[in-house]
């Protein structure tokens, strides 16, 4: 956060990447070995400087159940005193996998902190569940209005329930078998994992063609585009 630290004019940002063995985990630690890309390089993907109003949405998380969704929204504001509050409005729209708008819900809230968490309930009457055969994706759009400023963010999600019963895993009340492969961050041609969603879509399509339904990323976390591709491929 560079708020109040930048003066008018041209600036240069410098990143220092330190790959020294600071943790002393020895060579047997998979996530810290020279065999995989997690240890080789510094920063991949996107680096950017964003301007946002003080009143904006910090993050959105969606929790699903068999009745609908609960949204966890983190809002930011210019409120820094417990004796000061701002009135704000949260508007939630949900779009179905077929592109139909399911309806709008409006919530009036009190903002009493510079960063606060609120939960909002949105019921869905007819649910198109997500699974490996039907990777249905909904879109939740949240609009935050506070102190004359407006911020809008969207997130895609799949409706599913997961539970266990007699040592069996149930997805949407149906037993599933986890059949997977492993990804150890080994990409020798580039020296880093792909940051293009189309590459991940192709990878998951190939993996799925062998009858598999999950990938375990061993000792590292893939980029956002990998998760988005996996959601869409089931």
Model-predicted regions and their roles:
Residues 1-218, 223-233:
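Secreted/periplasmic carbohydrate-active enzymes, especially glycoside hydrolases
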């Amino acid at each position: 956060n560079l708020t109040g630290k930048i003066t008018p004019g041209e600036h240069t940002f410098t990143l220092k990447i330190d790959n020294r063995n600071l943790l002393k985990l020895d060579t047997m630690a998979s996530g810290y070995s020279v065999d995989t890309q997690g240890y080789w390089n510094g920063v991949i993907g996107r680096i950017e400087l964003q301007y946002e109003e003080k009143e904006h949405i910090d993050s959105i998380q969606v929790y699903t159940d068999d009745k609908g969704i609960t949204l966890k929204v983190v809002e930011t504001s210019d409120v820094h005193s417990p004796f000061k509050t701002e009135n704000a409005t949260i508007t939630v729209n949900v779009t179905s996998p077929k592109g139909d708008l399911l309806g709008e819900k409006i919530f009036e809230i009190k903002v009493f902190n510079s960063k606060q968490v609120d939960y909002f309930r949105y019921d869905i009457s007819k649910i198109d569940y997500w699974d490996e055969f039907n990777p249905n994706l909904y879109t939740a759009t949240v609009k935050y209005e506070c102190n004359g400023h407006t911020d809008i963010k969207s997130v895609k999600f799949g409706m599913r329930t997961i539970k266990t019963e007699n040592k069996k895993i149930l997805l949407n009340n149906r037993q599933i078998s986890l059949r997977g492969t492993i990804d150890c961050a080994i990409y020798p041609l580039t020296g880093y994992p792909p940051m293009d969603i189309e590459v991940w879509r192709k990878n998951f399509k190939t993996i799925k063609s062998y009858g598999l339904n999950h990938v375990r990323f061993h000792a590292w976390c893939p980029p956002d585009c990998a998760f988005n591709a996996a959601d869409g491929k089931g």
